[in-house]
Regions:
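Conserved beta-strand segments of the P-loop GTPase G domain that flank and frequently precede/overlap
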Residues: 123, 160-164
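Active-site-adjacent loop/helix micro-motif of nuclease/hydrolase catalytic cores
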Residues: 120, 129-141
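Well-ordered, non-membrane alpha-helical segments in soluble/globular domains
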Residues: 35, 61-67, 138-145
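C-terminal tail/extension regions appended to the core domain(s) of diverse proteins
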Residues: 1-56, 70-76, 133-136, 149-157, ...
Length: 237
């Protein structure tokens, strides 16, 4: 179970995850998958569509491959009978109506238990354009969706996956936190942003994978904790 605590200034600490919990087991599989994702992704992506290149691949292509390889990873660990990975539909009627209008608001992927209970929500975003703030907010903005409870409303923990297509992890860490800082100083924002929204210093998992953490206040629900996995696709160009 996730446990949420606060320090004496009211800033939430990142929640601990019990070592042998279901969520911990799922996160281990997700991380194992992402460690080998860049090479495996390109191999299967080109087999599926030989018109794809590093310049025309989009977010949906990456998320489709991630869903496929996560399913294979759960099977490799003999867990495919316990968990399923699938794209998600809009999480409520309001989102469904937005989808009909062409506004994509559903979470990208979810890991569910055998009884259908959602264990983990995963939102995938490209990090490819220093002027594209969709990782933080916008028409399909990532972090803001969690803060507004459009994504993962019933969860206390979720993941974002950033597909880095240019620049370095350090560049994007600085850029994303800059975008968040700008939201903190924006007058009239419909959702509240503060220092807890800032991403922690990236922790290296491999040459091609880092992880950051953040905590986000929400409209009504308790704060949600996010682990941000950034996977480098730069060397595939």
């Amino acid at each position: 179970m996730l446990s949420q605590s606060f320090n004496n200034t009211g800033t939430p600490f990142f929640p601990s995850i019990a070592k042998d919990s279901t969520l911990s087991k799922v996160l281990e599989v997700v991380e194992c998958c992402l460690l080998g994702f860049p090479e495996k992704c390109w191999q299967t992506m080109f087999n599926r569509d030989n018109t794809l290149t590093p310049d025309n691949v989009d977010e949906t292509d990456f998320n489709t491959e991630l869903s496929h390889h996560l399913s294979l990873e759960f099977a490799f660990f003999s867990l495919s009978g316990q968990f399923t990975v699938r794209p998600e539909y809009p999480e409520n009627r309001s989102q469904a109506s937005h989808s009909k209008k062409g506004l994509r608001r559903q979470i990208d992927l979810a890991v569910r238990s055998a009884n259908g209970k959602r264990i983990l929500a995963i939102e995938g975003k490209r990090l490819h354009d220093p002027n594209d703030k969709q990782y933080v907010r916008g028409n399909t903005g990532g972090i803001a969706r969690f803060k507004r409870e459009d994504h993962g409303k019933e969860l206390g923990f979720a993941c974002m996956v950033g597909y880095v297509q240019q620049e370095t992890f350090a560049f994007w860490h600085k850029k994303v936190n800059q975008w968040i800082s700008n939201e903190m100083s924006t007058v009239g924002n419909t959702i509240s942003w503060d220092e807890s929204d800032l991403l922690s210093t990236p922790e290296s998992r491999s040459e091609c994978l880092v992880a950051c953490q953040s905590i986000h206040l929400r409209l009504k629900e308790a704060p949600i904790a996010l682990t941000h996995y950034w996977v480098s696709m730069v060397h595939l160009r």
